[in-house]
Regions:
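N-terminal post-signal-peptidase region of extra-cytosolic proteins
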Residues: 59-66, 76-78
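Acidic/hydrophobic-patterned starts of short beta strands in beta-sheet-rich repeat architectures
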Residues: 70-80, 136-145
Length: 170
């Protein structure tokens, strides 16, 4: 297994790495056997590595498939890490050329993607609506739960041509 630390080694020495971060490694897209070859090549062309963490599990994370734009359409999403920045790349209908980028941010701690459906989205809205959670639109396909730092998550949901940030776990 190839292991790379994020950023410059001096920034992530044990004394300077945030304690909640855990050990983050990055894998080549080729390490994901279920990922279609055209998407692997597209990720490599963008120089993406897929961030992982050894916290709690050795299971590979941050490559998922689901219906993120239209029910029944198989889309792929991967966390792309480059130069200390991570973002979610969504390959619509499995196409390596029809790609949306969402949630681009500095890598200050690990992130983990999962597929969520209508029930999860509505339950989290109900639990947090008194705290000002955004009311979701009609839910007719899946969303991407973007968890970070083992603290909270945001559901990325495609609606009417743009990404909405809906309430996730807190």
């Amino acid at each position: 297994m190839t292991m790379l630390l994020i950023g410059e080694p001096s920034l992530y020495s044990p004394s300077r790495r945030p304690s909640h971060q855990g050990q983050i490694i990055k894998l080549s897209p080729r390490k994901f056997a279920n990922l279609p070859a055209p998407i692997i090549r597209a990720l490599e062309a963008r120089r993406c590595l897929i961030p992982q963490t050894d916290y709690k599990t050795k299971k590979k994370i941050n490559v998922i498939s689901g219906s993120f734009r239209t029910a029944g359409q198989k889309d792929w999403a991967a966390m792309c890490s480059r130069n200390g920045i991570s973002s979610i790349l969504v390959f619509w209908n499995g196409s390596p050329t029809s790609v949306a980028e969402v949630a681009r941010m500095n890598e200050t701690c690990w992130r983990a993607l999962s597929v969520v459906g209508r029930q999860y989205i509505l339950e989290h809205y109900e639990a947090y609506k008194e705290a000002g959670a955004l009311k979701p639109p009609p839910i007719d396909h899946e969303g991407i739960d973007d968890g970070f730092c083992e603290k909270a998550s945001t559901v990325r949901y495609w609606y009417r041509g743009k990404w909405l940030d809906l309430q996730g776990a807190d």
